[in-house]
């Protein structure tokens, strides 16, 4: 069963931003601006990746997953572990997840990808049609 839908990858945007930093057109302080809440979420809810920080190169980046959705209530806007995401996907209808990479040393952070999780809502006004498989008569009967 495929859980992630409507996946958006921000790798090209990340590459362009890093090119700006490496060329000197964008300052390091402009991209190393993770707030304390994000850094704390990385410490307690994040998953260490195999990618080292592109700015300081001192440590592996940490991936933090943030959930958003009106029907999530107080959970919306919070960081969640992979295990919690699976649990939320079984309990709630569609909600979005934003994965941010963060360096806990220099505060580099960037959106890596976003996707939708949760039960798929049937389209409004859709009806189930009877087919030969679910009991309708066929022309040969």
Feature locations, PLM:
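Short cysteine-rich clusters marking metal-coordination/redox-active sites
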Residues: 53-56, 103-106
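Short Fe-S-cluster ligation motifs
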Residues: 80-97, 137
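Long, charged interaction segments in nuclear RNA/chromatin-associated proteins
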Residues: 2-5, 46, 54
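N-terminal alpha-helical interaction blocks
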Residues: 1-36
